Each structure stands twice: as structure tokens, then as C-alpha cells.
């Protein structure tokens, strides 16, 4: 997922560790290579149905679970999540949360088993690196760019069980297996890392809910 200088640096470090320093080689599964941050304790079980219902009712949720992502995209562990059916959510994220230009698009995260019903593309996109035309833009306008495209991410239960279960619950409620997914940070900030970062973000940014390793904060 780190297609650039950052990925080259990680590759060089792994090569040095294995080939020069004789460290054992670790075989990463494909879904593991994008979550290379520090591991944090899961404080409690997540009430996926409750969080999904809040999103369906219009809440913007700061979502922190597991290791943080490596690479240029938020891939479901350090994300701001919202309902893609409501155009107002894109405006609110741009104007109030991110404080950036009104026209900036947001990416969707979609269940892999359903992505071809919603996006005109032939292969999964687990690292949010591909852009495709949206097949049903009238149903998910908040993630559809002005040219009808969207840079989407697909997710499986094996790849990210927490975000997968949340989207499953959202689909049960709405019939839509898609969420807005954008990086968990405010204007001029890096993506959040620690639980303390998440609590501070919730206290200072007008999101409706934060889910921090199972702990729920809400207004």
C-alpha cells in the first residue's frame, strides 16, 4: 500500500534485517501489510449494531481499532466514517471536520463480496489504490465525484474483521454495504495514532461519536 519513497524505506529495512543482520523472515499475509502500527489493547467488545444505527441516523464517527495503517490511505483502522447516502455528510466532513475545500471528494469502503454491484471494476481494491465509475451514484452521492468516479476500498472479514462487521450491520439497516471512509485527522494534523489522540480529537472536533478500541464516546 505504500507505493512511494515510504514503501522503499520499509522494504530496504526488511531486506537489511533479513539478508545482512540474519534476522528471521516474517511472511506477512496480504491483508497484514497495510497495518504495521503499534498494537493496542481492545478495551471491550464493539456494539457494531448500535454504531451502525448511529451512522444510519446521520452520525459522523471517529473509528480507531487495531494497528494503524502504513501508506497514504486510511484503511478502516484510523477512519472517519459516515453514511454515503446523505450528500450533507460530505459537506459536513469538508466544512466542519476537515475544514477544507467544498469540492474535495471522499472515498468509500465496501464489502468485497458486493463491490461489483456498486463500482464498475473487475478486481478488488483492498488498499484504496484504484478509481472506478460508481454504478449507482444516486444511492451513494456522498462518495461520488463530479465525474461519477470514486476511489474505493474493498474489505473482507479476514482482512479487517471490525470494519467488516460494522459495514455488515449497516447493510442490514440500510441495504447499502458501503460507508464513507476518510482519514482520522483534522485540518493540518497527521492521522491519529494512540487512544489518547482519539479522546483529544473527540473533545476538540465536532464528531458525533468516537469508537476507540471498543470504548464508545458520544454526544
Describe the residue ranges of each PLM region:
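Flexible beta->alpha loop and helix N-cap segments adjacent to enzyme active/binding sites
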Residues: 1-219
Amino acid at each position: 500500500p505504500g507505493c512511494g519513497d515510504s514503501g522503499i524505506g520499509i522494504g530496504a529495512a526488511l531486506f537489511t534485517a533479513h539478508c545482512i543482520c540474519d534476522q528471521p523472515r516474517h511472511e506477512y499475509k496480504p491483508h497484514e501489510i497495510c497495518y504495521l502500527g503499534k498494537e493496542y489493547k481492545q478495551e471491550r467488545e464493539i456494539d457494531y449494531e448500535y454504531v451502525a444505527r448511529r451512522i444510519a441516523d446521520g452520525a459522523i464517527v471517529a473509528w480507531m481499532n487495531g494497528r494503524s495503517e502504513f501508506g497514504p490511505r486510511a484503511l478502516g483502522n484510523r477512519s472517519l466514517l459516515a453514511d454515503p447516502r446523505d450528500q450533507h455528510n460530505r459537506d459536513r466532513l469538508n466544512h466542519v471536520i476537515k475544514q477544507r475545500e467544498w469540492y474535495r471528494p471522499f472515498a468509500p469502503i465496501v464489502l468485497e463480496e458486493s463491490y461489483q454491484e456498486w463500482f464498475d471494476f473487475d478486481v478488488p481494491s483492498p488498499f484504496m489504490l484504484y478509481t472506478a465509475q460508481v454504478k449507482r451514484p444516486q444511492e451513494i452521492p456522498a462518495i461520488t465525484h463530479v465525474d461519477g468516479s470514486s476511489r474505493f476500498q474493498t474489505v473482507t472479514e479476514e482482512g479487517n474483521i471490525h470494519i467488516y462487521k460494522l459495514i455488515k450491520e449497516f447493510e442490514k439497516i440500510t441495504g447499502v454495504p458501503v460507508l464513507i471512509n476518510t482519514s482520522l485527522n483534522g485540518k493540518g494534523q497527521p492521522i491519529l495514532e494512540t487512544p489518547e489522540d482519539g479522546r483529544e480529537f473527540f473533545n476538540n472536533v465536532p464528531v458525533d461519536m468516537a469508537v476507540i478500541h471498543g470504548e464508545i464516546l458520544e454526544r
